[in-house]
Amino acid sequence: MQAATVVINRRALRHNLQRLRELAPASKLVAVVKANAYGHGLLETARTLPDADAFGVARLEEALRLRAGGITQPILLLEGFFDAADLPTISAQCLHTAVHNQEQLAALEAVELAEPVTVWMKLDTGMHRLGVRPEEAEAFYQRLTHCKNVRQPVNIVSHFARADEPECGATEHQLDIFNAFCQGKPGQRSIAASGGILLWPQSHFDWARPGIILYGVSPLEHKPWGPDFGFQPVMSLTSSLIAVRDHKAGEPVGYGGTWVSERDTRLGVVAMGYGDGYPRAAPSGTPVLVNGREVPIVGRVAMDMICVDLGPNAQDNAGDPVVLWGEGLPVERIAEMTKVSAYELITRLTSRVAMKYID
């Protein structure tokens, strides 16, 4: 009997990379593997994608793990470097780095490096989080072009704030700012992440940066979901029934007695809970798959267990398989039911959840 286990489907991951190439055929792809590859395993994910043009990470430590694991493709530090003392390592490991503020620029100008580094100047086109403001961007760019520690030409990157809201006008405005600044400049350009790839083909440019969609999960809050775009879920969160019991009409279930059965039924208990990272906020009615059949969660999610209503005629037994999300049950459905984003669901699973890789 298997308790909480994440099953990672390498074949689906490779399929999704190919699907991204179909959607952005003129662009190279930075496969974003930050946050332990969105919960899928940093090194295993990168090794599964030898055809990725580059990888994107949030921390230098992630990049160094990839290099130590034999990954030779370009690796982009999406948030840049946090300490000037990291620059010699970035140079020696042939890493690419975003540069988005005056402190980073000054550090690049002051350091002595054996080899220059490849730089992506981050332009703030409307996210207002990281990046150089448009009115300061030209002077910043010129300093980078004259910096001996920067490999030329300087590349330009930005990030959409509302790519998943195609009617709001914000993305067009960001594109206008980005295009105006990039005009006539020789470096590579990148602004599209998952939402841009799916909804804004005019934003694909030289490089696109698929994140959550690489793993078969849509960045959109509502339908269409990943499978609707031709992607396959890479992660399946699975477990088993540890008990099946008769349950009488009128009896409550679990802490607080928040769910009371209206009929005699069969109740299943699943070895899964918020101690594994499953959302405690999941309400009664949230679906799971038992033996491939959709059944509802009933009562509160506990630390180690979830109860499900198997139905009065159920023939399920202890030890039978359960899928909490993944193949046959998109995680986007769970996100919609629980009001917890799919990003958070797949990245917050705890260390007691086993990981298994299949082809």
Curated annotation (Swiss-Prot):
SUPFAM superfamilies: Alanine racemase C-terminal domain-like, PLP-binding barrel. The active site is at K34, Y255. The modification N6-(pyridoxal phosphate)lysine is found at K34. The keyword Cell wall biogenesis/degradation applies. It holds the Pfam family Ala_racemase_N. SMART domains: Ala_racemase_C. InterPro entries: Ala_racemase, Ala_racemase/Decarboxylase_C, Ala_racemase_C, Ala_racemase_N, Ala_racemase_pyridoxalP-BS, PLP-binding_barrel. Pathway: Amino-acid biosynthesis; D-alanine biosynthesis; D-alanine from L-alanine: step 1/1; Cell wall biogenesis; peptidoglycan biosynthesis. GO terms for biological process: cell wall organization; D-alanine biosynthetic process; peptidoglycan biosynthetic process; regulation of cell shape. Its EC number is 5.1.1.1. HAMAP family: Ala_racemase. This is Alanine racemase, biosynthetic. It comes from Salmonella typhimurium (strain LT2 / SGSC1412 / ATCC 700720). The lineage of its organism: Bacteria, Pseudomonadati, Pseudomonadota, Gammaproteobacteria, Enterobacterales.
